[in-house]
């Protein structure tokens, strides 16, 4: 069975489940958030990466590596959410400098 992803918009006083992949059973590997919680990123072991620019209300799948054949190991973002990093198993790291709008291989 997959895992669930939860977000808090009040400093952890309460939590709500969010479903980036709909009702699919996903094993989540990593997650990141901007300081204000508006920008979110969730990395799945099955090779999918999701971004929200609406505090988790809506999610969009993105493929920085061009395909979903490698599991994501780590993701991170700057405090304002503009700069995002995502790394896949095997050592490649991808960078976005426009809130996840486009990606390039960083190293």
Where are these regions (language model features)?
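A short loop-to-beta-strand structural motif that recurs across blades of beta-propeller domains
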Residues: 3-7, 47-51, 91-95
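Conserved Ser/Thr-centered positions that define the repeating blades of beta-propeller domains
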Residues: 8-9, 34, 52-53, 78, ...
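Beta-rich catalytic cores
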Residues: 27, 71
């Amino acid at each position: 069975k997959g895992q669930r992803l939860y977000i808090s918009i009040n400093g952890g006083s309460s939590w709500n489940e969010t479903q980036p992949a709909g009702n699919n059973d996903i094993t989540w590997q990593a997650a990141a958030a901007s300081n204000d919680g508006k920008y979110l990123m969730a990395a799945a072991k099955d090779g999918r990466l999701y971004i929200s620019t609406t505090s988790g209300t809506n999610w969009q799948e993105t493929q920085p590596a061009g395909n979903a054949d490698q599991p994501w190991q780590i993701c991170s973002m700057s405090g304002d959410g503009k700069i995002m990093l995502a790394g896949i198993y095997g050592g490649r790291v991808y960078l976005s400098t426009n809130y996840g709008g486009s990606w390039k291989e960083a190293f």
